[in-house]
Each structure stands twice: as C-alpha cells, then as structure tokens.
C-alpha cells in the first residue's frame, strides 16, 4: 500500500477501508480503552486524528510510547469523524513507531516564541509557524515560474560566484581560496588575487541582471530567480544578507509594459497563495498579522498608482515635511521619500 499524505486524506471525497499514513505525533490524550493522537506530516497545517484502541496487540508495548514528537506509521480505516471541527479520522488497525521521542521533546501544543524556536533550529520546521511559512514559500516559488513561463519567458541560470557587480546593488561578499593568514603578496605589498582560484577577485552575486540583459538581447523575454547576497551590515526588516530575487528582462518593452507586468505578477501571486494556501494564510492572520488578509485584498482590488518622477518630486516638495535628505528635481529618492509616497498619500 502506498502512503497517503495527510492533506489528501483530509480532502478525501469518501471513506476508505485501507489507508497508510506516516508522520509525527503532535498531541495525544488517553481515555480508558483507547488513545487519540493528532498526526501531522507537514503536508498541511491541520493534522488528522488517529484512534488507537487498547485491543491492538502492541498497545501497551508500543502505542503507549508514542509521545509527542514520535515518528509513527499507521494503517487503518478512514472514517467520518464523530468530533467537531474535522471531517475524517483514522481508526488504526496497525501501529508502528518509526522513531521515538521522550518527555524532553521541546515542541509542545502551546505557542512558542521565535527566540525559543531559534534555540531548537533542528526542530523548528515542525512548528506551525515554520511549516506554514515554507509551504507558502514553496507555493509562491512555483507560482513565480508558472506566471512567467505562461508568458513565454525563458528561465536562465546566472552565476552565483562572479567577478561582476551591478549598479547600486550594495557591497559584495568576497569569495577566495587564499590562505588568509598568509596570503600571497604582490611586489607592491597588496594581496595577489592572480594566485586565487579564478585568477582574479570574485564575489557572491548581488544580481543576475547583467547576464539576464545579455540573454534578453538574444532570447527576448528571460528571467532569473535565485539566491542573491548583499554585504550590507544594516540590521533592519528591509535588509537581508541573503535572499531570493526575481529579475525579468524584456526585449522590445517600454516602461508602461514593464509596470503592467509587475502589477499583474504581484496580483497573480496573491491570488495563487489565497487559493492554494488558505489555511496557512489564515494562521498568519490569526497569530502573526491580523491585518494580513485585508492588506492582500486591498492590493488585489486596487489598481497600482502610476506616478512620474517629476510628479513625485512635486508631491514631496509640497508636503511641508522636513526631510533628512533634501528634495529637489534631479536628486535620488530615499527610503523616507518612498515611504511617504506609498504610505501617506
């Protein structure tokens, strides 16, 4: 018998006489003649209830040891649940412990802080928060490819180790195989990068833009989607040393076409997440950000405002605010200007 994912068991159209589930025990509670165990395999936020009767031959020797965190395999029947809030449950016919967890297992039913989860990094993917984050992230990554592939964009892989920089991309992480304690030196007293692995200075990429632009001049519409690294020691919610970035490059396209594609892309991802990750988004809305769903719906319902650079400067000059970075036509817009335009207008 092949394994059934719990998300598929929960969505089953009808009962099943035989089903095989594998996963980890989230909770258990014992009655006089049977035990209830919530089983989760990471395929969905919600687990499924397993009922283990004390008449099972290994109830006392094995099932009784299936504590929270234990890895188990269950064969049984998928039946309509007698309890509220769940459509199906599994009545176990066979029960096997694949990996035990003792009483010191740190993830319990109660909520845990991010600081606590950071201390148990090897187990935090089992938490509801991390499971939801990475299910949504996985779905969005798929939707990114789906959107651009449906528009006949070609996916190009650009170097992660490179000697190229990008305009305005920030500082770069150096990559070297030289002995940093005793590096080879030039006659001028500088580190001899010619002796390095590539014979020159190399870095982790800050952008695949340059390579993507080259491909766009031959393949028309291309995109990159991969890890990007910025050596900016800025400890803010808007900076990360490593993140994944999507960079489309479009031949024969003007700024209006580029903006229209960006708006369509963002709204496509939101709709896709709402359709395929509803339970995870509901979890975020309940426990992380109560305004999340309203904000997503606002983005979907409203057209993106187009504002020229000249119009933006005029709005900022007329605002009467005292800017840390003075505003004048020809100057670059800073974060404070962007926040004002997007949050206060």
For the regions a protein language model found, what residue spans apply to each?
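Short amphipathic alpha-helical segments with coiled-coil-like heptad repeat character
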Residues: 32-33, 212, 256-257, 320-322
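Catalytic cores of large soluble enzymes that bind and process phosphate-bearing ligands
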Residues: 132-136, 254-261, 304
């Amino acid at each position: 018998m092949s394994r059934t994912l719990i998300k598929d068991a929960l969505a089953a159209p009808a009962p099943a006489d035989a089903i095989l589930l594998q996963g980890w025990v989230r909770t258990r509670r014992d009655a006089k003649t049977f035990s209830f165990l919530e089983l989760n395999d990471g395929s969905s936020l919600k687990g499924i209830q397993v009922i283990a009767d004390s008449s099972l031959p290994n109830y006392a020797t094995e099932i009784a040891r299936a504590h929270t965190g234990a890895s188990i395999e269950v064969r049984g029947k998928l039946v309509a649940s007698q309890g509220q809030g769940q459509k199906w449950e599994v009545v176990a016919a066979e029960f096997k412990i694949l990996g035990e967890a003792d009483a010191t297992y740190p993830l319990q039913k109660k909520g845990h802080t991010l600081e606590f989860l950071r201390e148990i990094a090897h187990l935090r993917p089992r938490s509801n928060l991390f499971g939801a984050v990475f299910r949504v992230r996985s779905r969005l990554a798929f939707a990114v490819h789906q959107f651009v592939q449906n528009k006949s964009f070609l996916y190009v892989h650009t170097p992660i180790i490179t000697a190229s920089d990008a305009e305005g991309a920030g500082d770069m992480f150096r990559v070297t195989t030289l002995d940093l304690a005793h590096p080879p030196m030039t006659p001028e007293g500088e580190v001899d990068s010619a002796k390095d692995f590539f014979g020159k200075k190399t870095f982790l990429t800050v952008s695949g833009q340059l390579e993507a632009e080259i491909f766009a001049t031959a393949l028309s519409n291309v995109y990159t989607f991969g890890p990007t690294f910025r050596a900016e020691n800025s400890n803010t919610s808007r900076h990360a040393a490593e993140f994944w970035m999507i960079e489309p490059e479009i031949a024969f396209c003007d700024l209006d076409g580029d903006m229209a594609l960006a708006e369509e892309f963002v709204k496509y991802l939101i709709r896709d997440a709402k359709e395929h990750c509803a339970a995870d988004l509901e979890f975020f809305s309940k426990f992380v950000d109560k305004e999340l769903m309203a904000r997503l719906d606002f983005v979907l319902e409203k057209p993106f405002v187009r504002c020229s650079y000249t119009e933006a400067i005029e709005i900022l000059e007329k605002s009467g605010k005292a800017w840390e970075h003075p505003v004048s036509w020809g100057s670059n817009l800073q974060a404070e200007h962007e926040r004002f335009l997007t949050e206060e207008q």
